[in-house]
Amino acid sequence: MNHENRISELTQEQTEFKRDIGVFGGVSIIGGIMIGSGIFYLGSYVLERTGMNSGLALICWIIAGLISLFGGLCYAELGTAMPKAGGRVIYLNEAFHPVVGFTAGFTDWLIGGPGSIAAVSIALMNVLQSFFDVSAFGVKAGAIVLIVALTVYNLFGVKAASMVQSLSMVAKLVPVIIVMLAALFVGSVSPDLSLESANTYAEANDTSILAMVAMAVVASLWAYEGWTNLNTVAEEIKNPKRNLPLALIIGIGGVTVLYTLFNFAIMKVLPHDEIVSMINNEDLYLGTAVAKKVLGSAGAIVVSAGMVLAMFGTANGMVLAQPRMYYAMAEEGHFFKSFAKLHPKYKVPTV
């Protein structure tokens, strides 16, 4: 295939896939993968790396959100120019060389994809273990059953998978928003958002504010990870030239607002000294502590429900998105041909 034909194929919107994902479905894939259990504890790492300065920690959450949004805008441009399944595999092929795209896709197939899905599934079962008497073997068996069930369900078409993703995202947001709004309205602490203590910390530790921000943003970026997965299913998005960038902007922008407000809500409930004491004692689940304070004994149940739903959405989102990269490698002719086959009825890669 010559270069002109190759570019023409990548830019046209005709496809064998079913374009069943709308804007909300796209937002659900992004939010479903991005918003995980980390919302309840990653704030501790950000605070720790900013010298326990509340104002600087919130700035870092916003900076990480803006970095993710800028990345999302770049992906929106790539996705509208080349609305094909495979995401970064396609982009790396075109920008550099097919070897680079294949290396990224093969690494994800061998380690990154299954490793991430397994880790999230085990973590989900560990949360349930605190409510049910389940052995270590039971946790692993439950995780395997979950992965197999999600995989089988996703074989019945992207419309069904997208619907579950949308429902799970809404369901996971309910407990998170309940905790956040309760904390914002009930919390009586007035957090000190000045940067004075950060300057003092920087001088005492022979560092700089910029270095502290850089380290803290790395921690907060982990919470934003996952937005790249939407482009993997670009070939299944309705009107991708409009809906793909819209879903990326709404999804990443909304998560940025949620993360910033949630961490501010924590500071509204827990006095700064208590936060510092918890982190120093390696009790990192600040969100859980807030839920227990504002909701009483029901707080732990609300948080656990939120964590389970969040991880379920993350697992389903990865099971939905990742096979499209392997499809793209096979379609390029660099991977097993069977991976490029779509189900004759449901039009999803099944191998």
Region spans (language model):
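Membrane-interface "cap" regions at the ends of multi-pass membrane proteins
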Residues: M1-G55, L69, L73, A85
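Helix-loop-helix connectors at the membrane interface of multi-pass transporters/channels
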Residues: H3-R6, L10, V89-G101, S121-G142, ...
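Hydrophobic, membrane-embedded alpha-helices of multi-pass small-molecule transporters
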Residues: I21-F40, L146-A149, A183, A202-A265, ...
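Lipid-exposed faces of alpha-helical membrane segments in multi-pass integral membrane proteins
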Residues: G31, I35, I59, I63-I67, ...
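Hydrophobic transmembrane alpha-helices that form the core helical bundles
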Residues: Y45, L69-I147, T151-L155, A160, ...
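Inter-helical loop and helix-membrane interface segments of multi-pass membrane transporters/permeases
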Residues: E48-G51, A118-L146, T151, S188-V213, ...
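TM-loop-TM module centered on a large, flexible mid-protein loop between adjacent transmembrane helices
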Residues: I90-Y91, Q129-S130, V134, A247-N316, ...
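Membrane-interface loop-to-helix entry segments
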Residues: M125, G138-L195, E225, L248-G253
